[in-house]
């Protein structure tokens, strides 16, 4: 039986083919559209990102921070060096969701939410594209291991070996050398981005800040081929960095330690100078702090403890402490009186225990209420007689007195390389009119003559004023840097020397200061007992709170922090000075009883050998004989 013949439905087949063609065409168009959209997104929307990423996938220039210059004391003892350390760095452009990566870091290293906040703050600071940002320093071996195990979860994160500033002497030189710290937003805006590329710390205070350009060095560069994740494939070219310059300071660590020991646990300042050169031999401000805390970022808790301490360990008393100079200024006032011709060395003033201006009934008291009788210049300095200097200040007048004391550095910055120094205050008629809108009164001139009133000075200024007496008016600006890479620092703004009409006036004041230490009635004679050299000195007391006329100072009724400050300045050997020392003991009350022994101990540490004998280079043929005779 034959099969039936099927007739093909061409219309149906055509519809089927057309449907398939249309579907295929739509699919192709859709795919092409998706590809075009994706291409547009990559090439247009994300052009800048992928262009940079592509470039960095081929050649990446990464900075090589220069090793920072080292800092030594005058004998070659290291004060500031660099030690290797491992830090955790993160490149935001290679980390994708970098905030999520921070969360992983905190989890992996078991850190606190406070650490997370600090990390984010560091990541948001201004920086160059594709520059790694250190977020955690001083990694332990365990932390490094944890990062390595979880590296796949931490894109853009790497452990980096680097040199970190270190202060092996701890708190000894915190107020002179200063410290380094992280570059903040304000500093970042003012720094040359090329010179500080890859650098995250900068000198904040002291020598570290003043000589930042010399210590920093010059950044090097490395051209490397990397993949998109930042992994270095090969080094194409390298330009080595130029290390920073080494600095040798004039400070002596043994003298520094001796000064700290002499001051004990008391709040105060000690500064020692070489009057012939201006070199700072010791510089102590107590209490102090460990500068290593600041290098990689101090914790909020640690900083709060330092900042809020009632003893103010962060405060540099040598450079910024402002105190009335008290009677330590009297040698300079004496020079002013002699040079102005208002007194001679033999001029005598009668002291009944007080001084009164003509036509005034106010009594300006001498510290010795019973009076010293007739006193000349020598006796006035030896006894620190206030009445004599009231009279001398009155004869000079405020205009001449202010001008002369300004020549000694009072009221201006005196150092060559101490960034934080305060100028202090040397009051004048014009100053009071401008700041207080008041006229100058005669009584204010009197108390200025004994270092009280508006006058404010730093321990460094008092040391320099005393150095001018020791050096017979020759100015040598105090400085900390002895050499910078072997070169001595240059004073581009030298101070004019003090030229007297009669140079022998220096010797007259010098002799009076020697009598303070060695005279039978000298105010600080006890501090010179057993000295193998002649000392010229002057005690002082700086009032913290005023005492009404007729009242007597009663320490039992005064709070400890309201008691007078103790001051003393001196130089030795008196006939050929090798060291000048200025001491301030906060609330120490007695310059001769508290501050003078500190000066003596510092001088002994510098002038005597290990056996307690005067070093040969400091010996004077008649110094021991003269000392014994006065005692």
Model-assigned labels for residue ranges:
Residues 1-300, 322, 342-345, 350, ...:
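Periplasmic/cell-envelope proteins involved in peptidoglycan metabolism and beta-lactam response
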Residues 2-8, 80, 226-236, 276-328, ...:
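Beta-lactam-recognizing serine transpeptidase/beta-lactamase-like catalytic domain environment
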């Amino acid at each position: 039986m034959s099969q039936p013949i099927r007739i093909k439905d061409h219309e149906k087949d055509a519809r089927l083919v057309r449907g398939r063609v249309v579907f295929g065409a739509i699919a192709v168009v859709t795919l092409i559209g998706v590809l075009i959209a994706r291409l547009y997104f990559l090439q247009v929307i994300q052009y800048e990102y992928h262009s940079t990423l592509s470039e960095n996938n081929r050649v990446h220039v990464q900075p090589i921070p220069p090793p920072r210059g080292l800092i030594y004391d005058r004998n070659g003892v290291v004060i500031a060096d660099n030690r290797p350390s491992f830090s955790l760095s993160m490149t935001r452009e290679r980390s994708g969701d970098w905030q999520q990566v921070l969360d992983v870091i905190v989890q992996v290293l078991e850190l606190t939410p406070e650490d997370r906040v600090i990390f984010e703050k560091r990541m948001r600071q201004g920086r160059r594209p594709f520059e790694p940002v250190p977020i955690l320093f001083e990694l332990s071996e365990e932390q490094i291991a944890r990062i390595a195990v979880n590296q796949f979860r931490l894109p853009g994160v790497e452990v980096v070996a680097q040199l970190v500033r270190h202060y092996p002497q701890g708190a000894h030189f915190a107020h002179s050398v200063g410290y380094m710290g992280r570059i903040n937003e304000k500093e970042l805006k003012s720094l040359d981005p090329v010179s500080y590329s890859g650098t995250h710390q900068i000198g904040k205070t002291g020598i570290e800040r003043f000589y930042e350009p010399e210590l920093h060095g010059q950044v090097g560069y490395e051209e490397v081929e990397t993949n998109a994740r930042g992994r270095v494939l090969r080094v194409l070219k390298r330009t080595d960095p130029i290390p920073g310059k080494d600095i040798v300071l004039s400070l002596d660590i043994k003298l520094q330690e001796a000064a700290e020991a002499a001051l004990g646990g008391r709040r105060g300042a000690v500064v020692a100078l070489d009057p012939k050169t201006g070199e700072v031999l010791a510089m102590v401000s107590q209490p102090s702090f460990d500068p290593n805390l600041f290098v990689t970022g101090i914790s909020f808790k640690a900083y709060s403890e330092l900042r809020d301490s009632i003893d103010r360990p962060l405060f540099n008393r040598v450079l910024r402490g402002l105190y009335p100079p008290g009677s330590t200024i009297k040698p300079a006032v004496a020079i002013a009186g002699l040079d102005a011709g208002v007194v001679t060395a033999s001029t005598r003033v009668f002291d009944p225990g007080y001084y009164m201006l003509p036509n005034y009934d106010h009594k300006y008291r001498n510290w010795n209420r019973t009076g010293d009788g007739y006193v000349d210049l020598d006796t006035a300095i030896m006894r620190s007689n206030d009445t004599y200097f009231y009279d001398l200040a009155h004869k000079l007048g405020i205009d001449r007195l202010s001008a002369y004391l300004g020549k000694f550095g009072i009221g201006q910055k005196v150092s060559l390389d101490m960034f934080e120094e305060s100028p202090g205050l040397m009051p004048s008629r014009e100053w009071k009119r401008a700041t207080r809108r008041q006229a100058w009164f005669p009584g204010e001139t009197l108390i200025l003559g004994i270092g009280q009133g508006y006058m404010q000075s730093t321990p460094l200024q008092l040391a320099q004023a005393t150095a001018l007496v020791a050096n017979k008016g020759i100015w040598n600006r105090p400085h900390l840097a002895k050499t910078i890479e072997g070169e001595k620092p240059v004073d581009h703004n030298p101070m004019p020397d003090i030229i007297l009409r009669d140079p022998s006036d220096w010797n007259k004041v010098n002799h009076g200061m020697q009598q303070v230490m060695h005279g039978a009635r000298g105010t600080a004679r006890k501090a010179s007992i057993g000295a193998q050299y002649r000392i010229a000195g002057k005690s002082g007391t700086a009032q913290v709170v005023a005492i009404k006329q007729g009242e007597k100072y009663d320490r039992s009724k005064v709070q400890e922090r309201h008691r007078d400050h103790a001051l003393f300045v001196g130089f030795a050997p008196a006939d050929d000075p090798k060291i000048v020392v200025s001491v301030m003991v906060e609330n120490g009350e007695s310059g001769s009883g508290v501050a003078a022994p500190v000066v003596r101990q510092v001088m002994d540490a510098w002038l005597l050998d290990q056996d307690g004998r005067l070093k040969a280079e400091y010996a004077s043929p008649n110094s021991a004989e003269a000392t014994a005779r006065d005692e």
